């Protein structure tokens, strides 16, 4: 036997994460549907998951009251994961918002959370005016806020990761007349929501359709606004299908959790290169015009004017900023590097003017 290959195999196996299915049972899941008549407050109906026999569907979500919509569900095993497929048919015209929660069995206080591009651990390094545990330990957000429509929960104590990802095609969105509260969509959207919630001390994965954001919505930098919940019209006889996938893995630490989730997301979504009409070289050439049009050289310290820029006129302003938005010195370095590569003496000259002015006059 080739001992070198054997040892390599053992090392590779030791480094692999162990994927297994989330324990999706009626005892671990809950759901509700909110129905709204325009002009009136929505009414939320708790749903119970009932197993079906002699049917094309495994389960049906039912309420204590008769609803103008029927909701069926299948749970499919796929590569060690569980796919949740919802089938919804309207018996009458109805505006709805559907949500589901899957309890992980982990104590919420033992968990860290990850939503790609939006949430890391508990977001405690973010200001109180941004989404974080400073405001709440439970957050639901629109899927299109994230790099991929996924939420992951990492149990530090038991070293396991649980995640939910939306698998439907995100192809459309619709406008609303309001930005908070219960809002009626002007058309059809494909945007749902994802997040995590503390349910009586247990961490749960939460997801649904159409979107909602709670306990706050993050409308702009450092600005939390009241929650929003969208309602989409499903006309009588229309049907809707929604698909999510639940995934569970044994993970050593949170860093490995992030790595694993990204690899899982790529494997699941299989992103393809986007074909664009312009090459990277062409776009860099166009964007480099910023260094020309925004250069201000009639002040003691020279800079690129970009802070508080009015997009309607693109006029230069008298605001210079070294960090955050302005990044004058970083932009000067970028202009210098690009200018030298492209033999653009105008970019190189202005970049050195900025550096020299700061060396002479300081900040």
PLM features: residue spans?
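Sec-dependent signal peptide recognition
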Residues: 2-9
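Bacterial Sec-dependent signal peptides at the C-terminal "C-region" and cleavage site
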Residues: 14-24
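Beta-strand/loop-rich accessory regions of lumenal/periplasmic or secreted enzymes
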Residues: 23-29, 36-41, 48-236
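Low-complexity, Ser/Thr/Pro/Gly-enriched N-terminal "stalk/linker" regions
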Residues: 28-31, 40, 234, 238, ...
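Long, charge-dense tracts
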Residues: 241, 247-248
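Signature of short aromatic-glycine-proline-rich micro-motifs recurring in repeat-based ectodomains
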Residues: 322-329
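Well-ordered alpha-helical scaffold segments within catalytic/enzyme domains
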Residues: 329-345
